[in-house]
Amino acid sequence: MYLFTSESVSEGHPDKVADQISDALLDEFLRQDPESKVAIETFVTTGQVVVGGEVRTTSYVDIQKHIRRVINRIGYTKAEYMFDGNSCGILSAIHEQSPDINRGVVTANPDDQGAGDQGMMFGYACNETGEFMPLPLALAQICLIELAKIRREGEVMTYLRPDGKSQITVQYDNNNKPSRIHTVVISTQHDEFDSDGAMQAKIKRDVAEILLPRVVARLNPELQKLFDTAFILHVNPTGKFVIGGPHGDTGLTGRKIIVDTYGGRGAHGGGAFSGKDPSKVDRSAAYAARYIAKNLVAAGVADEVLVQLAYAIGVAQPVSILVKSYGSAHIALSDEEIAARIPKIFDLRPAKIIEKFQLKYPIYEATAAYGHFGRDPYTQELEIMIDGQPAKKEVTFFAWEKIDSVADILRAFSS
């Protein structure tokens, strides 16, 4: 028996505010020029947003307009929050991308586009949930998704403010299977509506009676049973959480990379996602690695899979591929033999990854809160520019979450 814990943060957490701003600006550059090369970092604090980074593009983006839109969408709309979309100051220090970097990703044959930087990226999948995600992180994300829905519905828990965090501890048995929920931690920003003790008691009661039943209702019956035994519940353990958001803590792009990925399971190469166009393999190759791992588990190759890809700047093919199945494989092949078959199934050149997952389109703001993985793919018609002319395009969001390579994997491993 052992315990494993993962955390998540809400869309109103200052670091996530920064991520969403960076990705919203990336989307607007890509909307007008799909060949845009973008790396945007955002800093948020009391009454102030600072954006900086490097961009190579033919498009013009109204930086202030889209920053204010994102902040208001998240819910920072009141002056009393000391950070709101209508009145915050905005400073832009975005400049042109280095030509030394650009030369590595521009080639005579577009399919041989090199990686935008060196580095290693990891993808992970397991069969603990229907989304092939680790259960502790999946539950932590659902808690905050439902809390945000409750806040926006405005019918109950009307004191909620945008900032919040969750943390879930799951107890596992000796066969590495979840056996029960051990601890739930919910910290949510709120209005000041009563004495400190009365506020904490009210919020804890509402979390237990309103939020958690909604969370459990989203789960399949097998996972619902994990909540049947008593568990520890901590709600706003400091007793009060009125001051929050960028007024309570500064926020920076790329500081929630474990929340964005697998909650501490698997591994992480260190590269953040938000604000980066898909020529940056920190992002695109991490999506590809997740796709490979998820399809391997879905195909029954193993119950748990970690995939590592590594690239060199300016080089199209990965310099290494690793697969780790943690002894859970269901086929008579070693992890090294499984890894050797990956390039025969998947084209891992950056240009082909970008093409397969439609990564040159404005799909990124949707990824910047509640995780880049374990999300349901969906198709949406987007207004974009093609050759300088307005156009509409059907684009799949979270395409790397599809399990449409299972047949290819089964064929490759049956030969």
Where are these regions (language model features)?
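Internal helix-turn-beta structural module
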Residues: T45, E304, Y311-S415
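Short, charge-patterned binding micro-sites
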Residues: V38-T57, I313-Q317
